[in-house]
Amino acid sequence: MREKVVLGTACADATAGGGEQQQVDASRVREFLAWDSKDPSYASWVSRTYRCFYVGLGKTASTRVKLSLHLLEGHRVLERPFPWLHARATPGESFVPTLGDLPVQDALGVLTSPDWFRFCFVRNPYDRLFAAYKAFIMRDASPPSPFYRRIAEEIRTRQRYGERGRRRDAIVCFRDFVQYVQETLPERQDYHWCQMTWGLRPDLVRYDVVGHFESFAEDFGRVLRRLGVDEEVIPHLLEPENEGPIEKLPLAAVYDWDLAEQVYEMYRDDFSTYGYEKHSWLGDR
């Protein structure tokens, strides 16, 4: 008989944590641990001091949350939080461990024990995808990333930039980026535009809090207070980090009905799981 691990269901509310109990094969949890240990984005963070577990996906304020955990654990302030903090690869520096760094039994405890506090953040999929485009495809990432430059060049090739009167060096338009994501998403889940249900695995991780990017200061403040962080420190841990210089546009200026439908179908599970409306692109300000 297969070993079973009891977990709870994730909720869309930022005060989640009391969902129905479900049973999950321990082998599936171990499969998740094996995947996490090879995750190049190092999305999971385990704070032993505060006994909390965080999974951070790109464009959901993950730099701010990771930096906060990094500092709360007593690690040195980094000269350049992005991208050093995410890669955990700076020589001579120490970092908060990832789940894959732990022995399997310890990691199972982090995922299943009521003694551990688990949280994550989500974002409206329309807004998150456009934010990823602005940060990595529309212009050079900061610092420049050869990886995302190659993706931009791949899109230009797929869409035949340089032909039919299109300049080869033209900025990749958002619609072409969306088409690229749709074509590659089944095989290539990038940390910054992956399906959130794929990256957060709510089927395996019982999150006590699922915070929202749209109410980040309030939700992360609640997380920090629950962890017992001193009240005078909290405002410094809520300051924006790694914000782009491009002014926010209403999503209705970016999407039309067809493009919104295309993105909705790509991220349908994210919309339903985390409580975002299909037509939310029309009401964004």
Protein language model features and the residues they cover:
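Membrane-interface amphipathic segments in extracytoplasmic regions
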Residues: 1-285
